[in-house]
Swiss-Prot record:
The gene is Slc12a3. The modification Phosphoserine is found at S41, S47, S71, S89, S124. It is a multi-pass membrane protein. Its main location: membrane. Changing R900C: Does not affect protein processing and glycosylation. InterPro entries: AA-permease/SLC12A_dom, AA_permease_N, SLC12_C, SLC12A3, SLC12A_fam. This is Solute carrier family 12 member 3. The lineage of its organism: Eukaryota, Metazoa, Chordata, Craniata, Vertebrata. It comes from Mus musculus (Mouse).
Amino acid sequence: MAELPVTELPGDALCSGRFTISTLMGGDEPPPAACDSSQPSHLTHGSTLYMRTFGYNTIDVVPAYEHYANSALPGEPRKVRPTLADLHSFLKQEGSHLHALAFDGRQGRELTDGLVEDETGTNSEKSPGEPVRFGWVKGVMIRCMLNIWGVILYLRLPWITAQAGIVLTWLIILLSVMVTSITGLSISAISTNGKVKSGGTYFLISRSLGPELGGSIGLIFAFANAVGVAMHTVGFAETVRDLLQEYGTPIVDPINDIRIIGVVTVTVLLAISLAGMEWESKAQVLFFLVIMVSFANYLVGTLIPASEDKASKGFYSYHGDIFVQNLVPDWRGIDGSFFGMFSIFFPSATGILAGANISGDLKDPAVAIPKGTLMAIFWTTISYLAISATIGSCVVRDASGDVNDTMTPGPGPCEGLACGYGWNFTECSQQRSCRYGLINYYQTMSMVSAFAPLITAGIFGATLSSALACLVSAAKVFQCLCEDQLYPLIGFFGKGYGKNREPVRGYLLAYAIAVAFIIIAELNTIAPIISNFFLCSYALINFSCFHASITNSPGWRPSFRYYSKWAALFGAVISVVIMFLLTWWAALIAIGVVLFLLLYVIYKKPEVNWGSSVQAGSYNLALSYSVGLNEVEDHIKNYRPQCLVLTGPPNFRPALVDFVSTFTQNLSLMICGHVLIGPGKQRVPELRLIASGHTKWLNKRKIKAFYSDVIAEDLRSGVQILMQASGLGRMKPNILVVGFKRNWQSAHPATVEDYIGVLHDAFDFNYGVCVMRMREGLNVSEALQTHTTPEALIQEEQASTIFQSEQGKKTIDIYWLFDDGGLTLLIPYLLHRKKRWGKCKIRVFVGGQINRMDEERKAIISLLSKFRLGFHEVHVLPDINQKPQAEHTKRFEDMIAPFRLNDGFKDEATVTEMRRDCPWKISDEEINKNRIKSLRQVRLSEILLDYSRDAALIILTLPIGRKGKCPSSLYMAWLETLSQDLRPPVLLIRGNQENVLTFYCQ
């Protein structure tokens, strides 16, 4: 714990207790009312510090709900725990800061306060302006049951029972329920893995799988619900139209009657929605009661003895032989098959997302969604099984409906179960002309019921409740999608109104879509696509649960435990299979739309971070493959140039970053290293902000690289840390890339000594080394500070982006003067594979003797062909060993003159002291020992000017200065001489003298 100094108390504040804890801020806290000797003085009510930290004098705090919530409670400032710096670093006596950390007038709201919601809070006393919130029964179970029940229950389930038989019908029901139950378990797991806000299915998928899949599903799910409003409304309108025609009172004509009734109905539903969720919920309860009454009416009807009219239509109340006959299938018609019946029934098992879609209007979504959804699935399944079994026990498959078809004495045979009940339907049964019976009459439930109009009312309730649920779901899901701004031009519809933040604009948009499809009246074509959109949602919900489980992320901790990742995977696969079983072409369209929207979001790359399981999966894959690389032994064929680039802040040297990323992009590792020089205590607070900003800059520039920074006392020690600690396992840098130090002649000699020391350290650590020089320089920050003219700034901008543009039909000149293992050849080969450098011609220059030029050229060409690099143009330099021109030699001598010791006539003690104080200076002995190397660099600079003045890039072997024998100033003079007069960028490369190229296949 971080201890606070105890301020002295005035004498009159002292009590008789043995221990006394003073207040943190002296007069800022109220003094104790009195000293009570019956308890230690540090337990008095005046010490709020005790309430927080068990009486210890510390700013550390106990666990509290508010420390983990995203926002504060309404009307109260947000509480935060002390930072690590507050606890660990030197404590400053800043009264306001300490008081904010330690003093809490609420006397320690601790972990038990987690019962209070942090944003949509549900306090025990409801405030006047508090939004309406629903429990699991009214908010989820009833809503899901109403959305699951539909016209198929009333008009198609008896027919499916007649076709498939009771046994296979139960199998169809249970298979459908298995899919929805697995999805319900997945929803329950996802919805209990953290606080769920508004947005329903879209929110669950997007926060689990990320914005890419979540955004695409959210958009099509909202659209599917909007069209679902039209589908259910048209179902209601068709029933009303049939009633009008039955009583001879049509409005206009059959098609326009549907349009008129549909538009009027959806307008009424819109008005209910706009009235608020409270009124919408009351309407749903009313519809639920109507359906319950219709069910009771049906069950009572099955118990009433059949009238003559009902008997003529095939109803004879419960009989065992009818039940036995209807156990087995009797396939008829085009759809007469198991999968045909399954495809017709399955949509009636969907609708389980209705409760989750209003997650923002639930009191406790984590409790309401699992309990309400699973209970809705259970009770609707019971209702389907019960209706299938009861109606299959009461009604025969074929009946004429003619009351005159009673049994009469005569020679004609009588076939079928009806014969045993005094009815002869043999003729219509043989001719397949029966109009009634379980397999022929869709209104069988109405016929069986005690009062047929109540079944019609049930159909009305089922269709209207489903339409209302779809209208609310479409608007709520779309509102959340708009707020996340994953797609353009939709933010207008995200605004909420009133205490419940009702999506009024979303309601109006869903209303417009519904009216459009009602007027089009071509729902038979669009309905299969909509069904597949819902199945896409089921598949992705199940996959979300599976993926979150399989990644083993510590953040996946659902409080609902009754799920299985393998069951979720099965649910995802079977949902896709069912899509194709229902309508294969609609499945292809649905998947195509999802992929299109997915690719759009991937292309746009929205700046959101929801901690998705995709991110966790990426980490798992990266970790698994990184560990797996440890088992792979190094091989020349698998060599990759993995670069540690000393960029400092990457945006200071954009050209260097661009150049290296050209040959490492999608190929190998690139780390941008940054050494922050200074005392660690002062620089540590900068690290996190600096790293985040530079990583964003790399991402914005589309550079696939890592950023790594260290704090060190000087550059050299910092780079040593980077070279030893950067990377992971086999993914460690093997090349150090640095920019050329242009100001070496005017800079402090110690910095030059550090710079050359970095190169020596790289060779000691078995790194290859690349030194990059551009005539304009690499550090744009210097240019921004020194240049003031617009022309100069434009030139710097062009130089900083030179490697982002195509290099044209110039040349890449490689001076492969010394064999370093092949790195000098490999890097230009990798560059040439990129589009920007693909048009450049590569020329290879090697040293040689004038009398053996052809032989040496052929030998190098043969070697290059074995390397399969595609380099065919080779030039031998026979004059490389000639003496340089005198003027160039003189310029080199003038360059090193300020750095010479001139120790020829000085005593040994003086020379030793000078060398100790100025190790970068060059003695006369070192001049003489390195004279041949120095002249070689001068001569090579002349050759570079002769051959490569107009090249796009010059690559040559980096000379090596022996440690202790070549002072830093002399080595810098070599590099300066090689590159100072060249217009093209120059890259000096020296590998670690190990092979990186091979012509063997193993």
